[in-house]
């Protein structure tokens, strides 16, 4: 298919050996799952970040009903998202969940028995570094969170200068990661800018934005990017959460729509790739590579929230 066709209009291409999550042959992989680690946008939520809608935008309670059915069956759902720490408490309250992993794995919020709230930053490679003289390894300067520490370094302004009119920060303050929209060469940014920074940082492309906050010169497609301490990832956050639950990998399922989400497959017994993710050639290649390496990857046959409900139904049927 021509590269000029927008991703949202492309037909999903399923790599050989990737079974539908609803296939009878997949039931054995799903039978032991007790925790679902799920991306939100493009996965659990309908386009536009909606819960009470289907993929086409029509009013629907199907996803809410699936969440209730999973909880009633004793299956825990944990959002693992690029959204900010500030949204965690609301997600836990509104969706009746006990854990939220935000900022691409940099923030974990837990609601413990009795209502006690526990939150922590996951700072990756920084945990072994002295961020200022006189501080212990991994200790942040007083009054600063990782997002503020990164901002204070000036790296965001250097990125804007390197990619004028092609990179913009979301205005909402965060806790760990910086979030941007635009269209830039991530490898060039890492090579020419981030490699020179005093503290190790990583910048990655989290895919196309189907509802971008603005437009770019030449109508370039708008991507979302995250800048965060090196070593931070959804994979590391899931490993941290699994350890706290004493949860074996084969009791965990992860689901998402991007190549970044595929990292979660390394900490779960099975991964489900969304049908909308399989419109992207980069995702198709990444899925094929992980299948060739022996990882267990399934796919939904329907996009976004409709595919998430498909996964939930298959999971319940396998019990």
Annotate each language-model stretch with its function.
Residues 6-20, 26, 31, 60, ...:
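Mg2+-dependent phosphoryl-transfer enzymes with acidic/Ser/Thr/Gly-rich catalytic loops
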Residues 29-53, 79, 265:
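Asp-based phosphoryl-transfer active-site loop
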Residues 34-36, 98, 252:
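The start of beta-strands in P-loop NTPase/AAA+ ATPase cores
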Residues 44-57, 222-229:
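Glycine-rich phosphate-binding "P-loop"
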Residues 47, 58-169:
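Active-site phosphate-binding/coordination module
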Residues 74-76, 99, 202, 251, ...:
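Proline-centered loop/turn at the N-terminus of a beta-strand
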Residues 114-150, 205-223, 281-295:
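Charged, glycine/proline-rich intrinsically disordered loops and linkers
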Residues 151-253, 258-267:
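Conserved acidic, metal-coordinating active-site core of Asp-based
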């Amino acid at each position: 298919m021509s590269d000029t066709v927008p991703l949202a209009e492309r037909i999903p291409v399923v790599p050989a050996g990737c079974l539908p999550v609803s296939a009878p042959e997949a039931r054995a992989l799903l039978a032991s799952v007790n925790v679902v680690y799920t991306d939100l946008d493009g996965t659990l939520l309908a386009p536009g970040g909606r819960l009470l809608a289907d993929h086409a935008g029509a009013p629907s309670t199907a996803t809410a009903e699936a969440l209730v059915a999973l909880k009633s069956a004793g299956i825990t759902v944990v959002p693992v998202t690029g959204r900010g720490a500030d949204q965690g408490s609301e997600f836990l309250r509104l969706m009746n969940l006990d854990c939220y992993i935000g900022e691409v794995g940099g923030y974990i919020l837990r609601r413990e028995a009795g209502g006690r709230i526990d939150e922590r930053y996951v700072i990756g490679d920084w945990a072994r570094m002295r961020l200022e003289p006189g501080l212990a390894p991994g200790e942040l300067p007083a009054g600063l969170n990782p997002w503020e520490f990164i901002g204070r370094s000036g790296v965001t302004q250097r990125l804007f200068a390197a990619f004028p009119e092609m990179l913009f920060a979301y205005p909402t303050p965060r806790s760990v990661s910086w979030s941007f929209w635009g269209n830039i060469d991530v490898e060039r940014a890492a090579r020419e800018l981030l490699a020179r920074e005093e503290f190790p940082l990583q910048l990655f492309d989290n895919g196309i934005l189907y509802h971008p906050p603005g437009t770019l010169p030449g109508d370039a497609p708008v991507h979302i990017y995250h800048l965060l301490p090196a070593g931070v990832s959804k994979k590391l956050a899931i490993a941290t959460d699994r350890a706290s639950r004493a949860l074996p990998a084969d009791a965990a399922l992860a689901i998402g729509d991007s190549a970044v989400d595929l990292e979660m497959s390394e900490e779960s017994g099975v991964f489900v790739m969304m049908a909308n993710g399989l419109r992207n050639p980069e995702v198709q290649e990444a899925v094929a590579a992980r299948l060739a390496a022996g990882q267990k990857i399934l796919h939904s046959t329907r996009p976004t929230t409709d595919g998430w409900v498909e996964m939930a139904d298959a999971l319940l049927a396998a019990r």
